[in-house]
Each structure stands twice: as structure tokens, then as C-alpha cells.
Amino acid sequence: ANMNAVIFQVRQGGTAYYESSYEPWGYYAGYQNPGYDPLAAAIEEAHSRGLELHAWFNVFQTSSTHDGSPAAEHPEWICRDQNGIPMSSYRSLSPGLEDVREYTINVAMEIVRNYDIDGLHLDYVRWNEHTNSQRNNPTVDQELERLDGMINKNEIEYLISNMSGRYLYDYQHPYSAGVPDGFISWEEWWRWSVTTFVKTLH
């Protein structure tokens, strides 16, 4: 059917669908060992049919607070708003924390080293979003001038509104402390943190 690969979700919200030494079994496994290794079984079935098996890996998204999940074990890792309040839903771990980057790389490498996967697909490899309406933003006219009219005013307003609604800080890098040392803007630091994670994993 013109198909050559299967994308199989191995990590969801800080839980696993394989034999993990780091994280608990996921929701669709009933938060318990299903009696077999879903990833190993999927790889065997895919390869027996001449298909590649690519592991779909949620990176910083950590919605689960089940025992053993990173959000439950390390609530300090969860992204915070300008007032230092952590996300309470659609949680995301902060890419800005070295402990988060190191932990997540260890989880990913557990899969790479222990399973005969043909690819690792990184999902949610970014800062997450949601309610934070207080961050100062450029005016629409300033953004339009910077972009030289490449997109229209409505699109700019949407982008600014979306940015102002994001949890973009953590307990080591609170908004109140200002831009982290060595960076000229929060945007530069946000980009650096995610890029550093990807480069290190690679």
C-alpha cells in the first residue's frame, strides 16, 4: 500500500510503551506491564513485513503525573510563568534545565541502545505554551516593520497573542531574574536550550 515505515509511539507524557528503567508504563498500557514489550513486538512485526520501525518520542511534554513519571518525581522541572507558578495542565519540562536535558537524553538513548529501531522521531522538542499574558511584547507595528510586510497584521497579532500565553521560565531561570547570563534576550536562550539538547542527543 505504498508504505515503507511505521511510526510507533514509545514515550507519551513522561511514560513508556517499552521496558523502561526510567519511566512508568503509559496510560494505554494501564500504567502496568502488559505482559509483553510493545515496542519489541512492534519492531518484530514491522521488520517481518519489510517495514522500518521509527520510534515516536515525546521530548519535553510531560502531562502524566503518575508515580515514577518525571513530573511526579521532579515537579521542580516543570516550566513556570512570569510569577514562578508551574504549569498545572499540558505540562512541559523546561529545556533550559541541564538536569532535564540530561535525563531526557538518557531516556532516548535507552531506546536507541536496547531496540533495533530504524529512526527516532522527536516530538514536542520545543518550549511549550499556555497561560501567561503578562510578558511584554513588541507592538504589531514594530513586528510589521521588522518583517517588512511579509505577513499581514492579523497573523502578527495572532503570533504575539500566542507568545504571550506561554510558560517560558523555570525555577533556575525565573522571569524576575532577567535574561540568563551570557544571552542577549530570552529568545536567544530559549533557542539555545533546545538546540543544545538536540546537538547533545545527536
Could you tell me what each predicted segment is?
Residues 5-7, 50-54, 90, 118-121:
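Structural preference for beta-strand elements that scaffold enzyme active sites
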Residues 1-15, 114-119:
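Catalytic domains of carbohydrate-active enzymes, especially glycoside hydrolases
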Residues 12-58, 181-202:
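Aromatic-lined substrate-binding rim segments of carbohydrate-active enzymes
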Residues 54-115:
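Active-site-adjacent "subsite" loops/lids of carbohydrate-active enzymes
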Residues 9-14, 57-61, 123-128:
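Short, solvent-exposed turn/loop segments enriched in Gly/Ser/Thr/Pro and often Arg
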Residues 116-121, 177, 184, 188:
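Solenoidal tandem-repeat scaffolds enriched in leucines and small polar residues
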Residues 18-30, 61-87, 125-178:
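Aromatic- and acidic-residue-enriched segments that line the glycan-binding/catalytic groove
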Residues 112-129:
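Extended hydrophobic secondary-structure segments
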